[in-house]
Amino acid sequence: VMEGKNIVLTKQNEKASEIITAVQQENISVKGVVTDTKGEPIIGANVVEKGTTNGCITNIDGEFTLNTPTNATLVISFIGCQPVTIALNGQQTLNVQMQEEALSLETVVVTAMGIKKKAASLTYSTQQVGGDELTRAKDPNMINALAGKTAGVSITRNSSGLGGSAKVSIRGIRSANADGNNQPLYVIDGVPMLNNTSEQAFSAMGGNNDTGNRDSGDGISNLNPDDIESMSILKGASAAALYGSQAANGVILITTKKGKAGMQRITFSSNLTVDHAISLPEFQNRYGASGETSWGAENASMKAYDNVGDYFSNGVTATNSLSVTAGKEKMQTYFSYANTTAKGIVDVNKLQKHNITFRETASLFNDRLTLDANVNLMTQKIKNRPTSGGYYMNPLVGLYTFPRGEDLSVYRDNNGFEKYDENRSMPLQNWYTDISGFSQNPYWLTNRVTSNDKRFRTLASLSANLKINDWFSVQARGNVDYINDNYEQKMYAGTTADVAHQNGRYIKMNRQDFMVYGDFMAMFNKTWNDWSLNAAIGSSINTTKVNSLSLDSGKSG
């Protein structure tokens, strides 16, 4: 190199020469066919030069062509097959046969203690239902959505209309008493919840068993189905080890949704269902009325009125739900609001329910400490909940025994269910026969024997899990469950004397349930080669308090 009048000599860079030589290395065109163990071509297999992005996929005949250096290594992969690695060493034609890869997907379930375990390691039977199954056809009581989806679980709807309870039994009835409690224990995120079914005979309010029962619903119906991630049915004595005798009928474990790291999502869903009375008795239309227990003469020209069909209408349930999910690596948030508006198959039966849920999860100290806080608020109002069973207060008795060939609309339209009484200067019940416990106007019972149910519920829980090391951790959980029920019933003057005074009857009830639950657990999880040991020891405390107040004017004044 000439620099002015000087000649400068420099040593050649050997590394640069090597790089140039490598870059200038000759490429070859590699062709091949990829097949399975039966010789069938595999379409869409990935063929990639190892360590680079240079690659292609096989065509419909399993063939591929790829330009690559002579000493390259190819990796062939396809879903469901074991990857194949081939060092070319100058080869330009390949025949590749791929072996199927047997994948064993282990099912993970949540145990009664809220701990995730492999299903195969459990010593009791369990079944799991996803949240999507529960929200496909939304019911005011979400537990009804389990019907027919799990083996050995029987679910019976109560006949008390909107907001009524459901009777659930796992592996058969355990109580010989028809009124015995066969209900399972409901556990939300590892914490038991109140599920009192306030179904009681009107005898508690001065009547007798013939007046039927008042069903004020159950606790599980208060939850928002859209908040449920999954539901597991746990069977066997060991499934309920933590909760003692209260879980003797089995456990239904509910896992709720929570925020997820790196996800921001707003979800809105709306659902509308229509109910209709389809299982009605068949009525004869050949004989007229005679006495209360016999038919009259045959009348071929008797007009057939659809008095029973006219009494019922289409029930409509509308549910709207909005949820917001947001989260970062260390903290996640979940919020939801839902409202349910429903009208029963009897027009005066109506329901209004609101749910608010807020959940916050956090991981601290390099994920050694996990915190989880959850608050659920619910308000519910139900008007004119139908009576379950009996005949004094059951409108179906008067509806079904009304004379064939007569038009019941006379006792319905324009307040035809009541008639002004000159002697008492007030409207009283209007009916084709004497008013008695056995026979009352069904439209009087739906319009002049009214009721209102109101419920407010709060569920709040907090849990902390501290990971001491890779195989030992401790957990503490606490929960508060508060329910405030108010019930009011009015029986107007003119209602049968079997249940009401001649001037009517007024009933008001208040009940407050308060439960505090706490538990502490130490968990050991250690693996040695093919052996593993899982152990947990803990203790729980549960305190329940009930306050109730009843006011009743009675049937004797």
What function would you assign to each model-found segment?
Residues 2-50, 73-82, 89-135, 143, ...:
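Short, acidic, small-residue-rich periplasmic hinge/interaction motif at the N-terminus
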Residues 2-8, 60, 87-91, 156-164, ...:
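Short, glycine-/polar-rich solvent-exposed loops and beta-turns at beta-strand/coil boundaries
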Residues 10-30, 136, 184, 274, ...:
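Sec-exported N-terminal periplasmic low-complexity segments
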Residues 11-13, 34, 49-51, 68, ...:
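Flexible glycine-/small-residue-rich
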Residues 53-63:
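Short, acidic Ser/Thr/Gly-rich low-complexity loop/linker segments typical of extracellular
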Residues 119, 128, 149-152, 161-166, ...:
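Residues embedded in well-ordered regular secondary structure
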Residues 151-155, 167, 227-230, 247-274, ...:
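Transmembrane beta-barrel strand/turn architecture of Gram-negative outer membrane proteins
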Residues 202-206, 283-290, 351-353, 388-397, ...:
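Flexible, surface-exposed loop regions and adjacent strand-edge segments
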